[in-house]
Structure formats: structure tokens, C-alpha cells
């Protein structure tokens, strides 16, 4: 990829779950050349980690072409999973070191595929600490969780 001509996009994501498991939602803020767009979705029965992951999947999927992305999440699970743990999981056929199946493998596979289309710098920000875009995402995710409209078909519960 020729990074000099790729669009540079900032993405902020958050997930929320009322009960964990329970109704959940994700929130996304995307910024390109100073213009912001927001996305959210609510699910009837899911987990917080699934919503954190789905936020990143949906955000990257919404980019119509390969981009340079700075993706900021308050989820260490997402950031560490996609930057560190996933390499071993893939080598072991989506099994953890203890030979047990990777939890949320369906979403890890989707996130991996979406991330491969882009050049992504995965960043972490402390949640509920006054970070403007993270607070926006949190509000979007919570509102979506309070008004679920979809089923999380990958959630086994």
C-alpha cells in the first residue's frame, strides 16, 4: 500500500452491556478531515467484550477503501487481543495456549480480516476519564444497549 495517498482516519470505539451478559450496544465516532460521523447498534443478549470488538469491526468495515487508521478504544481486551494474542491463536488454529477454544473467535476473525485491509495504530484510553470521544462512544453504546434491535447471532447464550 502506498501510505502517502491513503486517507487518514481517526476512530474511537466503545461497547456497553447492561448485565454482562445482557442487552448490549456499541458506539463509534469516526473523524476524517475534521468531519465526525457516529454509528451505534444495540443487541438483545450479548457481552461487553463482544460489543467492544463489534464496535471496532463495524468501524473498520465502514471504511470504503484502505486507510491509515488511529483506532482508540478503552478496551485492553481488544487492543491486546488484536496486537498480541491473535498471532498465537491463529498458529494454534484458534485455540488458546491451554488448548481451549478462543472466546469470541467469530469476532476475532472478523476483526483480523477488517484490520488487514488498513494500516491500524491501536491505541488505548482510560474509560470514564473525561476523554471527549470516548465519552461520546460510551453514550452511544449505552443508549443502543437500552434500545436493542438486533440479535447477536454469535453469542452462544
Swiss-Prot record:
It is found in: Cytoplasm. GO terms for molecular function: magnesium ion binding; nucleic acid binding; RNA-DNA hybrid ribonuclease activity. Its cofactor is Mg(2+). Its EC number is 3.1.26.4. It comes from the Bacteria. Mg(2+) 2 binds at residues 14, 138. SUPFAM superfamilies: Ribonuclease H-like. Disulfide bonds: none annotated. Mg(2+) 1 binds at residues 14, 52, 74. GO terms for cellular component: cytoplasm. Keywords: Cytoplasm, Endonuclease, Hydrolase, Magnesium, Metal-binding, Nuclease. Endonuclease that specifically degrades the RNA of RNA-DNA hybrids. NCBIfam families: PRK00203.1. Monomer. Belongs to the RNase H family. This is Ribonuclease H. It comes from Aliivibrio salmonicida (strain LFI1238). The gene is rnhA.
Amino acid at each position: 500500500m502506498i501510505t502517502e495517498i491513503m486517507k487518514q482516519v481517526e476512530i474511537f470505539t466503545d461497547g456497553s452491556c447492561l448485565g454482562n451478559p445482557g442487552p448490549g450496544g456499541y458506539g463509534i465516532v469516526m473523524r476524517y478531515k475534521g468531519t465526525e460521523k457516529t454509528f451505534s447498534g444495540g443487541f438483545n443478549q450479548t457481552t461487553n467484550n463482544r460489543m467492544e470488538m463489534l464496535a471496532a469491526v463495524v468501524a473498520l468495515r465502514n471504511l470504503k477503501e484502505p486507510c491509515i487508521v488511529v483506532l482508540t478504544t478503552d478496551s485492553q481486551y481488544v487492543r491486546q487481543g488484536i496486537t498480541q494474542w491473535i498471532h498465537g491463536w491463529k498458529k494454534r488454529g484458534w485455540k488458546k495456549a491451554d488448548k481451549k477454544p478462543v472466546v469470541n473467535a467469530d469476532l476475532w476473525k472478523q476483526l483480523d480480516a477488517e484490520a488487514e485491509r488498513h494500516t491500524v495504530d491501536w491505541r488505548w484510553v482510560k474509560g470514564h476519564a473525561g476523554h471527549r470521544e470516548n465519552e461520546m462512544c460510551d453514550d452511544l453504546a449505552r443508549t443502543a444497549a437500552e434500545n436493542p434491535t438486533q440479535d447477536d447471532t454469535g453469542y452462544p447464550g
